[in-house]
């Protein structure tokens, strides 16, 4: 395991490859889905996978048991692919009823004679009853944790027998559901298998590393009290010498504890996620041995102060970790709760690591063990939620919750990646309705506190959070002082400042009375712009607001981490790093600062650059101080006492030229865990209207880039009528506003954005501009002319259609808009599926050329579009921008313009490729360019 983990840490798979694999590796109809053992953390050698085709029948009127279906004969003609929930596309069965019956033949191998045989269900939602050859084996009520029934007395080894399963998933207000509105988990949704066990099998083997990491405590539990004296043996199979330890369990005992010294044990960490492989065997005279292969990570989870401060942080092995997490809804478009292949499940974890995150929050879903296994192997922390119910806080609901909580901790105790258990989310299911009010009553708060204490009694080695709070609710007893907030990017700096000022031991902020803050790490546990704008955003460029938030977080070291919503899109939220099909989204960062990626925004060594807005305004020639803040959240001493800061300042001007302004190199102080403001950069602005980018690189002494960042400055002023180009050519300049069209017609729609900032035409059609010949310009002095414009294709988004459709139901339960472009704030972010168009340019009736328009993009490159956004709770095509078109104007068209006194410039989109056209003005898009004619002078 260790060797694989190291290889994986050194090799980054292309994310495009990972995304394409999502669909490419779905199971074939003739194969067994998910053939791997579902419990790498607890597996026996003799097992048989029961995934695959089962007979299936719905039971809408609950008559199947009376009709004798338990004996194995279901109505003929239907089948389902296990372990996919009915209703999930991969199951092959539509969601038509609340009760489903499964049946199949099983054959226990002859070689299993003399052993106890069990059928094991990874998870089945919700009330599951099982029969073998008509004999009922038992019933399990719960949808998220494993259970098993013994077949031994009924087994006819080597012969076919009928296994029948009935699952009742009838809705109840107390039933745990989480966000199954994205796709219901109905019936069996994890691997089902047969397993041969010894005479008194192990029920659990839990490893608890000692605080000094020099040994491990081991707690073993048997399924039944020992019928005679038994011996338990542990063998550490990948430790030098394969050491073994043994303990005796006396007759009648059902548990054993061992303290095993492991001096100089290899530790588990995010950088080196080593796993200790262990074989546990229990045996006794005349009793078949039971052997389980398992593993653990030698690591501790605790809370320590950030060195040099009294700010509490989560720590792994005593070293603070600045948490950079993503909310993982853990949904697959074809399998819902169940991912089609193990490699796709692995890649979910790998994606997070590749963009520089150090953890995921498995959101109100108890995730499949193999996903946790991959987190263990790849070194990604897991915050694990218990699913919620949607009804009232009654005793039935709390019983369901406790059953799931106990099962989750029992199953997942050995996963070193799991650092915290989250009991409740946003007080869902905990409020009592009285009229129009939803109240979080003291009795519910006390119950939540008791659940926290229960979890701590079950697992004292991890952090426990009572309630991941939001929306005015507070904590009770908790190990983490977390909070949710969804804000526009411009509000983050003031918000985090206020929270930092109110975070201290004894503070009442973020807690329900009479509870108070103690020494809990303060962290954000959900953020994003998705709910930061009125009515949600739909699909938008999240990267600009994200950048502003991360800069704000890094300026405030009391904040011990953050958690972005979300890893991937779902059916009604589109703010994921990846889309629901796991195709990539483009941030545009690498076009602004060469080599910059999301990893730079997640770097342990971080320089926050510029003002909280990420864009400020200045006048031509003004000297501007650019603030710098160093957030060095690393204990590394490899860099000495200083690092190199390199700032490259460049600008785009009104002629569409990129001009280099300055390069500034300085040394900045370094010490481990340093958080401090640095001396600002003083930058002189260009003497003309421009978009200025201050691109910063943090380097070590060898020139290795450690982090990249940037800020922008909009230099205002009147553009020049005469100028000199970068190649020395002198030009006269004539311009017109983007919306100053003299004629236009579009097959679908035409509209403006923010008054005169941008002009859109959807479908096929044209815009026609008339640009006057410059006063006093002698035609004989003109050597040539070029038309300059920023343009893109223009998709007709759902919000742009003339429709009065409203969002439906509750977003948290799958409601809302299911069109990513329908929300009034939406403008789909640049991604892997471009929206092309093409524009034909004619000047005074003469063909000047055709240009391909690659896309209708929106990302961080739309600097001016973001700078133009009003602070009114809405977005107006934020981040959208075009490509810079330079179209030489034919001499005949220039001559006609000289005679007529104007250039008639027509931009046409043909109906053969009706991809629309957007024209950007000088205060919108990427470049400070209006539709412009450059007359090159002789």
Q: How should these model regions be labeled?
A:
Residues 83-108, 112-132, 138-141, 199-206, ...:
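Active-site-adjacent substrate/metal-binding segments within catalytic domains
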Residues 186-206, 299-316, 711-743, 928-938:
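Low-complexity, Pro/Ser/Thr- and charge-rich linker/hinge segments at domain boundaries
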Residues 132, 215-250, 256-258, 623-668, ...:
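Beta-strand-rich binding/interaction modules
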Residues 25-120, 171-181, 185-188, 306, ...:
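Extended carbohydrate-recognition surfaces in non-catalytic/accessory domains of CAZymes
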Residues 102-104, 145-149, 254-260, 677-681, ...:
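Short strand-edge motifs at loop-to-beta-strand transitions and within beta-strands
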Residues 45-65, 124, 184-187, 200, ...:
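Substrate-binding clefts and catalytic carboxylate motifs of secreted carbohydrate-active enzymes
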Residues 40-41, 57-59, 92-93, 97-202, ...:
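Accessory beta-strand-rich segments of carbohydrate-active enzymes
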Residues 156-158, 221-306, 688-713:
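Extended acidic/polar, glycine-enriched regions
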């Amino acid at each position: 395991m260790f060797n694989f983990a190291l290889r994986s840490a050194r090799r980054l798979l292309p994310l495009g490859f990972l995304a394409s694999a999502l669909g490419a590796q779905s199971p074939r109809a003739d194969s067994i889905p998910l053939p791997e053992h579902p419990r790498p953390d607890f597996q026996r050698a003799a097992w048989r996978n029961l995934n695959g085709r089962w007979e299936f029948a719905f039971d809408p009127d609950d008559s199947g048991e009376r009709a004798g279906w338990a004996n194995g004969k279901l109505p003929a003609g239907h089948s389902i692919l296990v372990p996919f929930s009915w209703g999930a596309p991969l199951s092959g069965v539509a969601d038509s009823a609340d009760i489903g019956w499964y049946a199949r033949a099983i054959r226990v191998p002859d070689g299993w004679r003399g052993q106890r045989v069990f059928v094991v269900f990874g998870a089945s939602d919700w009330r599951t009853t099982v029969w073998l050859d008509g004999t009922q084996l038992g019933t399990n009520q719960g949808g998220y944790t494993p259970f098993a029934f013994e077949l031994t007395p009924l087994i006819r080894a080597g012969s076919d027998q009928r296994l029948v399963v009935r699952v009742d998933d009838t809705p109840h207000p107390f039933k745990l559901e989480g966000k199954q509105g994205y796709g219901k988990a109905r019936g069996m949704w994890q691997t089902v298998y047969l397993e041969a066990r010894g005479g008194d099998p192990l029920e659990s083997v839990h490893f608890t590393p000692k605080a000094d990491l020099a040994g491990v405590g081991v707690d073993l539990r048997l399924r039944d009290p020992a019928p005679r004296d038994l011996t338990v043996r542990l063998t550490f199979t990948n430790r030098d010498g394969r050491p073994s330890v043994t303990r005796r369990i006396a007759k009648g005992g059902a548990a054993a504890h061992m303290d095993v010294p492991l001096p100089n044990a290899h530790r588990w960490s995010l950088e080196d996620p080593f796993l200790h492989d262990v074989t546990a065997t229990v045996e006794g005279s005349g009793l078949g041995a039971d052997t389980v292969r398992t593993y653990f990570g030698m690591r501790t989870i605790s809370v320590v102060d950030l060195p040099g401060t009294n700010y509490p942080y989560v720590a792994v092995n005593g070293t603070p970790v600045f948490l950079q997490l993503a909310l993982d809804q853990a949904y697959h478009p074809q399998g819902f709760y169940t991912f089609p292949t193990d490699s796709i499940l692995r890649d979910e974890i790998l994606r997070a690591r590749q963009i520089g995150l150090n953890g995921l929050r498995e959101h109100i879903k108890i995730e499949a063990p193999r996903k946790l296994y991959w987190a263990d192997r790849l070194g990604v922390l897991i915050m694990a939620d218990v699913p919620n119910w949607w009804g009232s806080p009654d005793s039935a609901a709390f019983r369901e919750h406790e059953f799931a909580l106990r099962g989750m901790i029992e199953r997942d105790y050995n996963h070193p990646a799991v650092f915290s258990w989250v009991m409740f989310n946003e007080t869902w299911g905990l409020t009592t309705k009285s009229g129009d009010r939803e109240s979080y009553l003291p009795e519910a708060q006390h119950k939540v506190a008791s659940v926290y204490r229960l979890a701590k009694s079950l697992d004292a080695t991890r952090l426990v959070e009572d309630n991941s709070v939001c929306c005015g609710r507070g904590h009770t007893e908790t190990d983490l002082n977390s909070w949710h907030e969804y804000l526009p990017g411009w509000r983050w700096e003031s918000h985090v400042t206020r929270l930092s000022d109110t975070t201290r031991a004894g503070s009442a902020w973020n807690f329900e009375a009479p509870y108070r803050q103690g020494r809990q790490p303060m962290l954000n546990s959900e953020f994003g712009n998705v709910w930061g704008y009125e009515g949600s955003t739909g699909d938008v460029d999240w990267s600009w607001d994200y950048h502003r938030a991360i800069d704000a977080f890094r300026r405030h070291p009391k904040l011990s981490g953050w958690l972005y919503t979300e890893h991937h899109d779902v059916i009604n939220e589109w703010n994921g790093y990846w889309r629901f099909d796991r195709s990539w989204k483009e941030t545009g960062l690498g076009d602004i600062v060469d080599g910059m990626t999301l990893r730079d925004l997640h770097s342990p060594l971080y320089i926050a650059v510029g003002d909280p807005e990420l864009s400020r305004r200045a006048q031509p020639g003004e000297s501007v101080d650019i603030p710098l803040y160093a957030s060095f959240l690393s204990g590394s001493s490899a860099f000495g006492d200083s690092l190199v800061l390199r700032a490259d300042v460049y600008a785009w001007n009104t002629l569409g030229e990129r001009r280099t302004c300055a390069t500034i190199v300085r040394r900045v102080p370094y010490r481990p865990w340093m958080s401090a403001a640095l001396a600002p950069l003083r930058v002189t602005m260009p003497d003309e209207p421009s978009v200025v980018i201050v691109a910063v690189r943090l380097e070590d002494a060898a020139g290795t880039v450690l982090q990249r960042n940037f800020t922008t400055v909009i230099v205002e002023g009147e553009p020049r009528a005469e100028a000199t180009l970068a190649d020395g050519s002198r030009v006269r300049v004539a311009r017109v506003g983007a919306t100053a069209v003299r004629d236009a017609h579009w097959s679908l729609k035409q509209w403006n954005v923010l008054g005169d900032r941008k002009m859109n035409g959807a479908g096929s059609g044209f815009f026609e501009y008339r640009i006057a010949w410059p006063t006093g310009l002698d035609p004989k002095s003109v050597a040539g002319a070029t038309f300059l414009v920023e343009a893109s294709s223009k998709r007709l988004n759902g919000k742009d259609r003339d429709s009065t459709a409203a969002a439906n139901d509750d977003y948290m339960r799958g409601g809302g808009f299911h069109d990513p472009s329908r929300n009034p704030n939406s403008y789909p972010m640049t991604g892997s599926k471009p929206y092309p168009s093409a524009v034909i340019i004619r000047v005074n009736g003469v063909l000047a050329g055709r240009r391909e328009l690659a896309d209708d993009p929106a990302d961080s490159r739309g600097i001016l579009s973001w700078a133009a956004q009003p602070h009114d709770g809405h977005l107006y095509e934020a981040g959208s921008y075009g490509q810079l078109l330079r179209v030489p104007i034919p001499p005949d068209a220039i001559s006609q313009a000289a005679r007529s006194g104007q250039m008639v410039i027509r931009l046409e989109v043909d109906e053969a490729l009706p991809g629309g056209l957007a024209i950007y003005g000088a205060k919108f898009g990427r470049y400070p360019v209006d539709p412009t004619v450059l007359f090159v002078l002789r």
